[in-house]
Amino acid sequence: MCDARMYTSQIEALKDIAECQVGYIGGVDNTANIARQVRDQAPENFALVGLSMGGIVAMEIVRQAPERVTRRALMDTNPKAEIDEVKAARQPQIEAAQAGQLEQLLREVMVLRYFTSHQPHLNWMICVLIWH
């Protein structure tokens, strides 16, 4: 869902002025290790953009190696620890995705959470992200 495909348009628009990379955040079990993994994939010095969970990872990268980050943009994120209610709600979603029910999860949970009648252009963008 929120992987490199989400940033295709931005990467294309910036290709003449910047080398853009989307860090891989899978395969590790905590924010510090995710940040280390992304940092290890990055050039020696780099600008950093983080959206939501990516912003949390970006803040950890800055904590670990501030001298490597030339500038940063953090969007729709916060520095606070996840509250227990959010953690509890996420676990059934993780289990559903692992059980091969990702499409059902997207239809029943994510679409309802992110679709809006007030901004129909966002609905189209979300559909493109979900179904491609």
Walk through the language-model features, giving the residues of each.
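Conserved hydrolase catalytic core segment
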Residues: 45-86
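Conserved alpha/beta-hydrolase catalytic His-Asp/Glu region
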Residues: 82-88, 100-132
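Alpha-helical elements of Rossmann-like donor-binding domains used by nucleotide-donor carbohydrate transfer enzymes
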Residues: 6-9, 13, 33-37, 41, ...
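Conserved HGGG/HGGXW glycine-rich cap/lid loop of the alpha/beta-hydrolase fold
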Residues: 1-32, 36-37, 47
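Short, glycine/serine-rich, charged loops/turns that create anion-binding
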Residues: 1-2, 79, 119
